[in-house]
Curated annotation (Swiss-Prot):
It comes from Ajellomyces capsulatus (strain NAm1 / WU24). This is Autophagy protein 5. There is a cross-link at residue 172 (Glycyl lysine isopeptide (Lys-Gly) (interchain with G-Cter in ATG12)). Residues 258-275 have a biased composition (Polar residues). Residues 123-133 have a biased composition (Basic and acidic residues). The gene is ATG5. Keywords: Autophagy, Isopeptide bond, Membrane, Protein transport, Transport, Ubl conjugation. One of its GO terms (molecular function) is Atg8-family ligase activity. InterPro entries: Atg5, ATG5_HBR, Atg5_HR, ATG5_UblA, Atg5_UblA_dom_sf, ATG5_UblB. It comes from the Eukaryota. One of its GO terms (biological process) is autophagy of mitochondrion. Involved in cytoplasm to vacuole transport (Cvt) and autophagic vesicle formation. Autophagy is essential for maintenance of amino acid levels and protein synthesis under nitrogen starvation. Required for selective autophagic degradation of the nucleus (nucleophagy). Also required for mitophagy, which eliminates defective or superfluous mitochondria in order to fulfill cellular energy requirements and prevent excess ROS production. Residues 107-133, 256-275 are annotated as: Disordered. It is found in: Preautophagosomal structure membrane.
């Protein structure tokens, strides 16, 4: 007997609780210890942002830093020498740069979204120095507190306004794409507006979902367009790493097909806009089929998304905290 389809809120919670094991080391150039400082190990939420870790990382590496005056907001992260954009959620960064194979088995996708590793509960001890045998291999990152890469990253500030404003602006943009106006986010109460950001910072699913439900219209076909961004990373063997971001407007449904004379075709009802139809429209050379990933596959939240999945349903349950559906293109084979 087939398992019942999880309610959207259950899938949302699984996505929200997905975590990635991290092993964060201090940049050797900034470390006063000859054989390097101990790494900081943590299972961190996919939907969260790396700068939230900076205060605890600054405290953890305090005795190892050459520059004892370095401030937490001066911190930035890199992977294999590539500065990581702090306004991207961790899950997106991982899908872009880690090189890990996305989940493809239908039987394990739900489990993967539920916990890339087991979700850490509020009362659990801080897992900054333990890696148990058999646990997933952590993603190895470096944290830096000097030599800010101004060409790649906007500087953070001591008050946290820069990252706050970047997040809220992204929420506003998603709201405008969905509704043709940013009225919903602009008319949020002051309490809900600050509560949204606080829920993201504290990884509070209950409060986040309550406020998100105000912003995102309920029921089918209530979106004017889907907030969708497609990320095209450079090939692994590329000499110069690069990232192309493609954004376009996609309504939740496709109008009935018309024949060459302009008369209605066989399809008289609008068809759902799917992952495959949107990718075929944007990147036909990579996605020549709307139903089968021939040359490339769409990756979201660490899993390969079915090409036939309706775009609106996917964004409702698997979008990131800012309301955007961020799909990474991964080559087949």
């Amino acid at each position: 007997m087939a398992s019942p389809t999880p309610a959207p809120s259950a899938i949302q919670r699984r996505v929200w609780e997905g975590r990635i094991p991290l092993e964060i080391t201090l940049s050797p150039a900034e470390c006063r210890t000859y054989d390097k400082a101990d790494p900081y190990l943590i299972c961190y939420p996919r939907v969260s942002y790396l700068p939230f870790l900076l205060p605890r990382l600054r405290a953890f590496f305090a005795t190892s830093l050459i520059d004892i005056e370095a401030q937490d907001y001066q911190g930035w992260f890199s992977f294999e020498g590539v500065p990581l954009k702090w306004h991207y959620p961790l899950g997106l960064l991982y899908d872009l740069y880690s090189g890990a194979d996305p989940v493809t088995s239908k039987s394990t996708v739900g489990e993967h979204l539920s916990h890339t590793t087991s979700p850490r509960q509020p009362n659990d001890p801080e897992p900054h120095n333990v890696h148990e045998p058999g646990d997933p291999i952590p993603w190895q990152l470096q944290v830096h507190f000097s030599d800010w890469p101004d060409q790649e990253l906007v500087r953070l500030d001591a008050d946290g306004r820069v990252i706050h404003d970047a997040f809220i602006n992204s929420v506003k943009e998603a709201d405008f794409v969905r509704n043709g106006t940013a009225k919903r986010i602009m008319t949020l109460s002051k309490e809900d507006s600050s509560g949204l950001w606080q829920a993201v910072q504290e990884h509070d699913f209950t409060n986040f979902q309550r406020i998100s439900n105000i912003l995102i219209p309920g029921g089918p076909n209530h979106f004017r367009n889907i907030p969708l961004r497609i990320f095209l990373p450079s090939p692994p063997n590329s000499a110069t790493p690069s990232l192309k971001v493609i954004q376009s407007l996609f309504p939740p449904t496709i109008p009935p097909a018309a024949n060459q004379t302009g008369a209605p075709g066989r399809q008289t009802q609008p068809q759902p806009q799917t992952i495959g139809s949107s990718l075929n429209s944007l990147l036909p050379s990579l996605f020549p089929s709307k139903r089968i990933p021939v040359l490339a596959k769409p990756v979201l939240q660490g899993a390969v998304v079915p090409m036939t999945a309706p775009l609106e349903e996917v964004v409702r349950v698997a979008g990131y905290a800012d309301g955007w559906l961020a799909i990474v293109v991964s080559m087949v084979g």
